[in-house]
């Protein structure tokens, strides 16, 4: 089981790689029921962690704007 401390220390890429491993293991059908339940729970936690990291990254993205007189500024990017 992945602890909250382990999750906090994981980068997006690390969490995504582990999530892909879990999906592969579940799709193989070779894991016993208890193991499947355990890794499914880990997968759900990893998915939430990845979504949190993506949302934080999205909020950091800024759009560079060229204003009057050539002044450059940044403003929050709009995503639809």
Curated annotation (Swiss-Prot):
<keyword id="KW-0269">Exonuclease</keyword>
<dbReference type="InterPro" id="IPR037004">
    <property type="entry name" value="Exonuc_VII_ssu_sf"/>
</dbReference>
<comment type="similarity">
    <text>Belongs to the XseB family.</text>
</comment>
<keyword id="KW-0378">Hydrolase</keyword>
<comment type="subunit">
    <text>Heterooligomer composed of large and small subunits.</text>
</comment>
<keyword id="KW-0540">Nuclease</keyword>
<protein>
    <recommendedName>
        <fullName>Exodeoxyribonuclease 7 small subunit</fullName>
        <ecNumber>3.1.11.6</ecNumber>
    </recommendedName>
</protein>
<dbReference type="GO" id="GO:0005829">
    <property type="term" value="C:cytosol"/>
</dbReference>
<dbReference type="InterPro" id="IPR003761">
    <property type="entry name" value="Exonuc_VII_S"/>
</dbReference>
<dbReference type="Pfam" id="PF02609">
    <property type="entry name" value="Exonuc_VII_S"/>
</dbReference>
<dbReference type="GO" id="GO:0006308">
    <property type="term" value="P:DNA catabolic process"/>
</dbReference>
<keyword id="KW-0963">Cytoplasm</keyword>
<comment type="function">
    <text>Bidirectionally degrades single-stranded DNA into large acid-insoluble oligonucleotides, which are then degraded further into small acid-soluble oligonucleotides.</text>
</comment>
<dbReference type="GO" id="GO:0008855">
    <property type="term" value="F:exodeoxyribonuclease VII activity"/>
</dbReference>
<dbReference type="GO" id="GO:0009318">
    <property type="term" value="C:exodeoxyribonuclease VII complex"/>
</dbReference>
């Amino acid at each position: 089981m992945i602890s909250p401390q382990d999750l906090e220390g994981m980068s997006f890429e690390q969490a995504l790689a582990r999530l892909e491993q879990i999906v592969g293991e579940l799709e193989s059908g070779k894991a016993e029921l208890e193991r499947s339940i355990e890794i499914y729970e880990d997968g759900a936690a990893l998915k939430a962690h990845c979504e949190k990291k993506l949302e934080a990254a999205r909020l950091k993205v800024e759009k560079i704007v060229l204003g009057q007189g050539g002044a450059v500024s940044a403003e929050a990017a709009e995503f639809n």
